[in-house]
Amino acid sequence: MTKKQQSFFAIASILLILFLDQWVKIWVKTSFSPYQTVALIQGFIELHFIENRGMAFGTEFGAGIWAKYALSVFRLLAIIGIGYYLRKVILTQNPNFSFLLAIVLIFSGAAGNLIDGMFYDFAFDLDKDFLTNWTRTYDENNAVFLPDEVRKTGFMLGSVVDMFRFTVTWPSWMPFGLGGGEIFPPIWNIADFSISCGVGLLLLKYRKNFGKSNDEKPLEN
């Protein structure tokens, strides 16, 4: 592809992934009740609506406002760095399609989850049913309320919406306590899937090139 075609592909792919990611998240958030589950393919994958304060696949990064700020700033810096690298690769090199696609997938996924944290607190009201990973406090009527220091809302403080979950389980005869348990229990979204595919593509296709300088050998296709 020419540089113009590469630029068009990168921009169009990023916009498409971001659109799909945000469309699914907003649809689930406005249509599902907290923790509501709907089977997509029985025994394989389902929709299960949750929100998380952490990283990809619901991984936690501390349990407070400063941890959330740190994670959001890290995401922002990572996106800026990846975006700068993507632009540099297109303008100064001739990346093959697989490498370009991998960087686009990683950038799109990181940007998709950052959008949640940046803007969702402005677009949606805080749902107190999603405080399971934060401190729950109860008033005299046994109703949940949230002290300011536990869950502040605002720019960079929104939760990430997750919804996809594989329901495939290990055979009952599996050792080490795996029998009957889910093979992949984390709940994820399109942004997480995009990042995982991008990283996986890099590892599969370019692992032999890691650690080599750019002038030693071009990336293999």
PLM-predicted stretches and their roles:
Residues 1-221:
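Alpha-helical transmembrane bundles and membrane-interface segments of multipass inner-membrane proteins
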